């Protein structure tokens, strides 16, 4: 045996390749020449071996990993008698075994169902096997603990459970499979007798350490081969520490320990050790002395400072990871364009690849950089994996909403996304779940917008919708229903694993999944996305292999679909794809230990923070560090502790910093992904001590001027992004420099630039912003939408005056939010209105007066009404679940409490309800519409429905009219809001009855009031217990009717004869009204009505002219955007466009009275 000793960059790997190549050239036929490397490096080393051009092919020379060598030995011995049990198969078997032995487990049964636990158990068993530990050694350690009285500790429970599981696993595997975890053990035992390496020369390269299993194999290799060369990354000057003279904190401690182990192994194997070959010169850094300085001195206690600023090393700090990766992309393009590097000569290293991998894939693609993310990618969210999981969950969870639509949205079911959206909206609206999916009859659920009549048949449009829903449902569920029927066939104990797996494959076959994946693969190849193409291909192959493993491992066992789902999920969770780099010239993004970068000239290290570089290894999920140390002291080595792994990470940091030959670029974010401050790695401090003039530079230039912005531009898409940022400032009211507008015109006019930048500019919405700020929809389009006669409602006018675009989106485009099967504020309001209206109508029908009813009689009537209305609300939603039945109790309690206080208005007042749910408007069976003529000849016709009209006939024969609007909460009529058109409804209803109420109240009608009546069950906060006789007055304040009433004391007296505070207006002892009360004289009512007409006229004119601007109001702290459903459509951003608000003047009642009095009955708003 001979060691090849040298530090990073000294040419160890190249020396191994050169010696192997020379031997192969000298004697093309002869004993094997084997280069033994880590599994993940085999592809890149083979490329390097053949890429030199000195070998035209491989005959003697072989690049092998330990696993591949084991396979060669078994092949020479006649092959594997039994199929191997893959890692995924083992996880699924473990899942079933844990379920089977659940009652015998001491600890694992508590966490067996947690995601990832099975994978951790499988990993622990693999680690134990690699350290040549079995259930016997675990039980010996458990017996030792029990002798010390510690058998019931957590460590004892873990040893017991692991030994039990390993025993069960071995019993299960025996005679059925071979265990890949035992391959190296078998290899060590059989290698010598196989004579595979007889006369062979072996080079071992790329390892920093070996497991006990691998050391046993190396011992057999030493005894079998003619010559073994082992390269180790140890600077020759550090080798004096070998033989146990190094501490765990020493940088090269992991490799020196490996050297010691190999020397001991050679001695035990009777193998002579030749003098080492020392490689003293850092050949890699011949053209970059700064990097040689890093390799030699970075981790030394004392080191000379580098004179001057290094030209080939950069430190970069970024605000966040995204900015950091974007800066790395720009640096890669600079290296390629200015330094002449190829993409394949650039390595990007991240210790936290999970945090950087997706960002690198996205941003590098945006910059046009070909890149391969070197990681085993999980496919847990691939549509095929999701389909399998969801299909089983549908059966197990009895067609719950989530699994059904996860199944449908995989795009593998033959149903289009538009059809799925239609079906999903219908299902959500009507709360469909469970057996309703399995019924043969078409669904007939329809939403009702009134509760006061029995169900009516579906109209033509509704029936067409129901027919379409039925067609989609039948097509979407037919294969899944067939799968369920196969699973649930009666007359047998239950399906076996083999049968369930067969049924799943039949489902995939029914859906033609293989054909769809092939089509996706072809599409990906056509657009040049080779990684995705291979992913679609591999995931199908791996799923079929998974099915084979399930059947081979558990085939004839009877499992319930629920347990089978758990077993399959364990396999799917561990399903990862290792993709070979699809291109020859591309940047490799990976971790230090996984990616082998040959011929790297530039290394970019991302995420050099205190937390991640080197990372702080977490404790193992099974054995804690303290438990590992205790076991090691007792003679049971189960692997390194987190502290030992931290020392290994320090060595890997050294490897990462010395990987590139020409350039080193280190970056770190100042904040993590959660926004918390992140400190730079200690490595950054060491670099600055080595290079005092090395200063961190910002990833993005801080100045917002054009030169700094353009300095960040590397691609047409980035140019568009820079222009978009500048134009977005225009939306905030700032001036835009002329050169940005010039660049904008370049992007719009240049076909290539526009193709790349159109999406970015569309996202910022600059063109749309210009359009909506400058021009309305237009009179012609408005005429098509509305006609010359604008028939509308007051709520629509309020929406327009709140924000014109809100009106346009809701009433012109008719955009609606998704209707859901839930009881929210609108449904509560609908129920309350219906119940109170029906209460009054039935009193009238039965010839009863409200004030003659006792509270109990009134409540019995209301209780009966609630029972009749409850099934009518949204397909019996109030009876559909315990949660909704509780809401019905809330409704019942609210109406009981509200009815009690509403009755006081009848008992202590003279106004009586004359009609409820009073319609007004064209083609409505009620009062005529409120009509307002427009200057251009058009007309606005207002319609609506008034909750309740009360009246009192005066001695003069005139009708005093009061309108009531029920509200599910306390509401005030603020005259300032009315003046601006934000709350027109209540006073417009009063005007509709006063001016057009002849069919209801013949004669002269006088406005007496417009009031909001609360229907709710408030809680009154108090500071101390309240006597029973004071409770009612306190609650009565909460039920007070609020609004505007006549200033006539007689009218106020008629509304609250007992002075109980039923309304806001109160009379003094002398019969006059208190100052500041919300009252109006007849003239003031006329002035309000005149103002109302002016608002309607102005509003109607703008609507018919096509006004649809995004111009939300702001009035004090309130804005139109607070509860607007259309914000995702308009994209109005208050933080970016504060100047975009239409600011309204805050006005109190005196201000309003002054304005409307000055305007009189004429003029504009």
Swiss-Prot record:
A Pfam cross-reference name: ADDB_N
Domain UvrD-like helicase C-terminal residues, every copy: 282-597
Cofactor notes: Binds 1 [4Fe-4S] cluster.
UniProt record, GO biological process: double-strand break repair via homologous recombination
Binding positions ([4Fe-4S] cluster): 803, 1121, 1124, 1130
Domain UvrD-like helicase ATP-binding: 1-324
Binding positions (ATP): 6-13
Signal peptide: none
Necessary cofactors: Mg(2+); [4Fe-4S] cluster
Keywords: 4Fe-4S, ATP-binding, DNA damage, DNA repair, DNA-binding, Exonuclease, Helicase, Hydrolase, Iron, Iron-sulfur, Metal-binding, Nuclease, Nucleotide-binding
Family annotation (PROSITE patterns): UVRD_HELICASE_ATP_BIND (PS51198), UVRD_HELICASE_CTER (PS51217)
Domain of life: Bacteria
GO terms for MF: 4 iron, 4 sulfur cluster binding; 5'-3' exonuclease activity; ATP binding; double-stranded DNA binding; helicase activity; metal ion binding
PANTHER family xrefs: RECBCD ENZYME SUBUNIT RECC (PTHR30591:SF1)
UniProt function note: The heterodimer acts as both an ATP-dependent DNA helicase and an ATP-dependent, dual-direction single-stranded exonuclease. Recognizes the chi site generating a DNA molecule suitable for the initiation of homologous recombination. The AddB subunit has 5' -> 3' nuclease activity but not helicase activity.
Subunit structure: Heterodimer of AddA and AddB.
Note: Despite having conserved helicase domains, this subunit does not have helicase activity.
Family note: Belongs to the helicase family. AddB/RexB type 1 subfamily.
Protein name according to UniProt: ATP-dependent helicase/deoxyribonuclease subunit B
């Amino acid at each position: 045996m001979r060691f090849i000793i040298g530090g990073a960059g000294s040419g160890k790997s190249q020396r191994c390749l050169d010696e192997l190549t020379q031997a192969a050239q000298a004697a093309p036929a002869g004993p094997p020449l084997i280069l033994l490397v880590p599994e993940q490096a085999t592809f890149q080393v083979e490329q390097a071996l053949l890429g030199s051009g000195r070998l035209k092919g491989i005959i003697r020379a072989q690049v092998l990993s330990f696993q591949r060598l084991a396979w060669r030995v078994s092949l020479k011995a006649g092959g594997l008698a039994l199929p191997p049990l893959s890692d995924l198969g083992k996880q699924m078997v473990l899942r079933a075994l844990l379920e089977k032995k659940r009652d015998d487990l001491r600890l694992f049964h508590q966490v067996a169902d947690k995601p990832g636990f099975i994978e951790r158990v499988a990993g622990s068993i693999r680690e134990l096997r690699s350290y040549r530990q079995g259930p016997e050694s675990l039980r010996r350690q458990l017996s030792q603990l029990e002798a010390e009285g510690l058998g019931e500790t957590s460590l004892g429970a873990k040893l017991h459970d692991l030994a039990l599981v390993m025993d069960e696993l071995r019993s299960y595997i025996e005679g059925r499979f071979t265990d890949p975890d035992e391959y190296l053990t078998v290899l060590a035992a059989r290698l010598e007798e196989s004579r595979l390496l007889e006369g062979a020369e072996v080079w071992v390269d790329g390892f920093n350490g070996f497991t006990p299993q691998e050391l046993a194999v190396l011992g057999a290799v030493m005894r079998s081969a003619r010559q073994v060369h082992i390269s180790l990354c140890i600077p020759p000057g550090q080798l004096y520490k070998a033989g146990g003279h190094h501490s765990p904190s020493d940088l090269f401690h992991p490799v020196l320990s490996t050297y010691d182990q190999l020397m001991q192994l050679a001695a035990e194997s009777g193998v002579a050790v030749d003098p080492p070959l020392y490689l003293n010169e850092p050949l890699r850094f011949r053209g970059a002395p700064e990097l040689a300085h890093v390799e030699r001195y970075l981790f030394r206690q004392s080191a000379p400072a580098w004179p001057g600023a290094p030209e080939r090393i950069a430190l970069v700090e970024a605000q966040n990871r995204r900015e950091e990766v974007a800066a790395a992309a720009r640096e890669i393009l600079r290296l390629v364009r200015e330094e002449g590097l190829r993409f394949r000569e650039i390595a990007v290293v991240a210790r936290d690849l999970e945090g950087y991998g997706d960002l690198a894939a996205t941003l590098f693609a945006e910059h046009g950089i070909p890149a391969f993310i070197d990681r085993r990618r999980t496919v847990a969210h691939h549509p095929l994996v999701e389909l399998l999981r969801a299909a089983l969950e549908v059966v197990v969870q009895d067609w719950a909403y989530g699994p059904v639509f996860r199944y449908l949205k995989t795009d593998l079911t033959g149903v289009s996304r538009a059809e799925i959206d239609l079906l999903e909206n219908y299902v959500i609206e009507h709360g469909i779940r469970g057996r309703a999916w399995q019924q043969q009859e078409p669904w007939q659920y329809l939403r009702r917008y009134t509760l006061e009549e029995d169900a009516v048949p579906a109209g033509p449009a509704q029936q067409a919708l129901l027919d379409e829903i039925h067609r989609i449902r039948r097509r979407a569920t037919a294969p899944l229903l067939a799968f369920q029927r196969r699973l649930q066939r009666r007359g047998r104990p239950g399906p076996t694993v083999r049968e369930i797996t067969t049924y799943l494959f039949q489902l995939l076959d029914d859906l033609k999944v293989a054909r769809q994946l092939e089509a996706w693969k072809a599409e990906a190849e056509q657009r040049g996305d080779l990684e995705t193409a291979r992913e679609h291909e591999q995931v199908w192959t791996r799923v079929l292999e998974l099915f084979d493993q399930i059947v081979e491992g558990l085939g004839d066992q009877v499992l319930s679909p629920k347990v089978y789902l758990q077993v399959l999920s364990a396999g799917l969770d561990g399903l990862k794809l290792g993709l070979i780099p699809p291109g020859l010239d591309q940047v490799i993004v990976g971790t230090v230990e996984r990616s082998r970068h040959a011929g790297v000239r530039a290394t970019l290290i991302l995420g050099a923070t205190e937390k991640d570089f080197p990372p702080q290894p977490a404790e193992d999920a099974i054995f804690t560090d303290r438990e590992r140390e205790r076991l090691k002291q007792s003679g049971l080595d189960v692997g390194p502790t987190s502290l030992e792994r931290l020392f290994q990470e320090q060595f890997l940091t050294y490897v990462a910093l010395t990987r590139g030959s020409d350039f080193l670029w280190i970056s770190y974010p100042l904040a993590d992904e959660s926004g918390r401050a992140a400190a730079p790695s200690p490595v950054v401090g060491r670099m600055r001590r080595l290079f005092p003039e090395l200063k961190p530079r910002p990833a993005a230039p801080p100045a917002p001027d054009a030169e700094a912005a353009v300095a960040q531009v590397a691609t047409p898409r980035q140019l568009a992004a820079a222009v978009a940022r500048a134009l977005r400032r225009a939306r905030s009211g700032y001036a835009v420099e002329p050169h940005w507008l010039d660049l904008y015109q370049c992007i719009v006019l240049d076909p290539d630039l526009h193709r790349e930048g159109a999406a970015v500019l569309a996202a910022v919405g600059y063109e749309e912003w210009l359009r909506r700020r400058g021009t309305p929809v237009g009179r012609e389009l408005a005429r098509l939408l509305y006609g010359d006669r604008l028939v509308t409602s007051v709520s629509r006018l309020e929406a327009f005056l709140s924000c014109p675009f809100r009106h346009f989106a809701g009433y012109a485009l008719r955009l609606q939010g998704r209707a859901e099967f839930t009881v929210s504020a609108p449904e509560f309001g609908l129920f309350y209105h219906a119940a109170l209206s029906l209460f009054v109508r039935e009193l009238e029908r039965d010839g009863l007066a409200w004030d003659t009813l006792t509270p109990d009689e009134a409540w019995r009537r209301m209780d009966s009404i609630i029972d009749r209305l409850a099934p009518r609300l949204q397909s019996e939603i109030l009876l559909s679940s315990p949660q909704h039945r509780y809401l019905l109790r809330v409704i019942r309690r609210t109406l009981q409490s509200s009815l009690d206080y509403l009755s006081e208005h009848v008992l202590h007042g003279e106004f009586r309800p004359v009609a409820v749910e009073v319609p007004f408007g064209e083609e409505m069976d009620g009062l005529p519409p409120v009509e307002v003529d427009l200057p251009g000849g058009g007309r606005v016709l207002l319609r609506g429905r008034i909750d309740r009209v009360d009246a009192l006939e005066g001695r003069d024969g005139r009708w005093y009219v009061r309108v009531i609007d029920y509200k599910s909460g306390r509401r005030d009529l603020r005259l300032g809001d009315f003046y601006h058109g934000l709350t027109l409804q209540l006073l417009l209803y009063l005007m509709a009855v006063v001016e057009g109420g002849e069919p209801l109240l013949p004669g002269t009608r006088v406005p007496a009031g417009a009031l909001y009546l609360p229907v709710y069950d408030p809680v009154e906060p108090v500071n101390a217990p309240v006597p029973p006789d004071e409770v009612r007055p306190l609650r009565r304040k909460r039920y007070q009717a609020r609004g505007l009433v006549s200033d006539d004391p007689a009218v106020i007296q008629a509304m609250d004869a007992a002075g109980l505070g039923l309304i806001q207006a109160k009379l003094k002892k002398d019969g006059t009204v208190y100052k500041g009360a919300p009252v109006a004289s007849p003239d003031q009512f006329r002035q309000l009505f005149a103002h109302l007409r002016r608002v309607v006229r102005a509003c109607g004119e703008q609507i018919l002219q096509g006004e649809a601007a995004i111009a939300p109001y702001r009035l004090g702290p309130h804005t139109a955007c607070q509860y607007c459903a259309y914000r995702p459509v308009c994209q109005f951003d208050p933080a970016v466009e504060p100047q975009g608000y239409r600011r309204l003047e805050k006005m109190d009642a005196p201000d309003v009275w002054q304005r409307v009095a000055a305007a009189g009955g004429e003029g504009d708003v």
